[in-house]
């Protein structure tokens, strides 16, 4: 299953140690009662609580943000068939969003250009760092051509930082999707997470690590989304079915929504934006979820040939379908009806994401919008293929890509209007 790199990927480019916070907000502060507890271990809780269901259309109300803005609340607690109480994935992920937003609230609104920390270089290190970023640039140019061109529209510091994050995400994805994936064990992912801790502590292992280590020392990037992406890789090793959308949502957050949380501090929020920092992070998260859902819908046949089904099992059953129908690869009326609903949901996530793009800094809007428009068009191509995602791979043609770029540019010029 390929990972959607949000903010950064065009259709042709896509190829237990995570933390969950039980957080309490007070003004601009956030109190984290979790430390580094495992998100999976916190799925079962014994208390009640509100759920921030910011899901795509309207914010549902009762919760209060630091800005005084109210959101409606649905219950975050879900009963399992065994009668246990669990916390929904969206609530858990939203707690992570709150932490990221609190972390960068002051830094991102000071000036149009991010206030990057200027370190005093150790003699001899500048050349090595320059070489490290150059190598990240080469990796991006080779494996993510459209993304690479988009980054050239950014300021030099942002561009280098996004390259470093992209390369780390790609290396992480290749642990379970690359040529050596069959040899990867949970212990190997544990070692990769230990190495991540070293990167954030200023102890890089190699040149590519050094670029990321430099990036996180300059920008207000938190380690948690990186840990969560590694947890998504663990999930891919042990899980090939998802009982419902709540489980699938958590997987999509791990492998793609995390990239949005990593990227917002680099992209920057427009100083004139009246939107809350939380809402911009929500939009980034929504784009990651939308991209990964699109990957899943595009790659149904490819994943089935690997024995994997990344579709909600309960929704398949409600549509009168099963894994056997997917492995058979027949496009039936039942399949078309099922796919229409899945595509509709993915589009709602794209719509929510698009609302937040105008809140980004001016230099970041165009590449982000281009990525969004191109990825959303994959859904159109699935429809054009009569929902045959078993033997036909939906893709956006070069002429359609060229048409999308000026549209994205025009949209990027629209100033922020949200309050």
UniProtKB/Swiss-Prot annotation:
Transit peptide: 1-74
Gene3D superfamilies with a match to the protein in the record: Farnesyl Diphosphate Synthase (1.10.600.10)
EC numbers, comma separated: 2.5.1.32
Pathway of action: Carotenoid biosynthesis; phytoene biosynthesis; all-trans-phytoene from geranylgeranyl diphosphate: step 1/1
Regulation of this protein's activity per its record: Inhibited by inorganic pyrophosphate and hydroxyphenylglyoxal.
Gene Ontology terms, MF aspect: 15-cis-phytoene synthase activity; geranylgeranyl diphosphate synthase activity; squalene synthase [NAD(P)H] activity
pH-activity profile: Optimum pH is 7.6.
Broad class of enzyme this protein falls into: transferase
One BP term from GO: carotenoid biosynthetic process
Physiological role: Catalyzes the two steps reaction converting geranylgeranyl diphosphate to phytoene via prephytoene diphosphate.
Family membership: Belongs to the phytoene/squalene synthase family.
Protein name stated in the entry: Bifunctional 15-cis-phytoene synthase, chromoplastic
Source species: Capsicum annuum (Capsicum pepper)
């Amino acid at each position: 299953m390929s990972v959607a790199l949000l903010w950064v990927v065009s259709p042709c480019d896509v190829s237990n140690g995570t933390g969950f916070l039980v957080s309490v907000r007070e003004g601009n502060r956030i109190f984290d009662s979790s430390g580094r507890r495992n998100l999976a271990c916190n799925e079962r809780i014994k208390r009640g609580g509100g759920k921030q269901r910011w899901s795509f259309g309207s914010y549902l109300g009762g919760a209060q943000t630091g800005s005084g803005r109210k959101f409606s609340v649905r219950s975050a607690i879900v009963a399992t068939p065994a009668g246990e109480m669990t916390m929904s994935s969206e609530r858990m992920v939203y707690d992570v969003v709150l932490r990221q937003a609190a972390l960068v609230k002051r830094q991102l609104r000071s000036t149009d250009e991010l206030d990057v920390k200027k370190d005093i270089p150790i003699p001899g290190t500048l050349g090595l760092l320059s070489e490290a970023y150059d190598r990240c640039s080469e990796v991006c140019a080779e494996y993510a051509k459209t993304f690479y061109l988009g980054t050239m529209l950014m300021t030099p510091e942002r561009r280098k930082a996004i390259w470093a994050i992209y390369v780390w995400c790609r290396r992480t994805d290749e642990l379970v999707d690359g040529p050596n994936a069959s040899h990867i064990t949970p212990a190997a992912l544990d070692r990769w997470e230990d190495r991540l801790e070293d990167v954030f502590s200023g102890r890089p292992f190699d040149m590519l690590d050094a670029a990321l280590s430099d990036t996180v020392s300059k920008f207000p990037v938190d380690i948690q989304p990186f840990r969560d992406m590694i947890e998504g890789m663990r999930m891919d090793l042990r899980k090939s079915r998802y009982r419902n959308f709540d489980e699938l949502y958590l997987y999509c957050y791990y492998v793609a929504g995390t990239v949005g949380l990593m990227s917002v501090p680099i992209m920057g929020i427009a100083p004139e934006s009246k939107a809350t920092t939380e809402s911009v992070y929500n939009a980034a998260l929504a784009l990651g979820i939308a991209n990964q859902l699109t990957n899943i819908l595009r790659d149904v046949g490819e994943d089935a040939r690997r024995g994997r089904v990344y579709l909600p099992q309960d929704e398949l059953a409600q549509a009168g379908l099963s894994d056997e129908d997917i492995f058979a690869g027949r496009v039936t009326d039942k399949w078309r009806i099922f796919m229409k609903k899945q595509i509709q949901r993915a589009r709602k996530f794209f719509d929510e994401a698009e609302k937040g793009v105008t809140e980004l800094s001016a230099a970041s809007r165009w590449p982000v919008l281009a990525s969004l428009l191109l990825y959303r068009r994959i859904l159109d191509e699935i429809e054009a293929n009569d929902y045959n995602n078993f033997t036909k791979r939906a893709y956006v043609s070069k002429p359609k890509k060229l048409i999308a770029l000026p549209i994205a540019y025009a949209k990027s010029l629209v100033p922020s209007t949200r309050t």
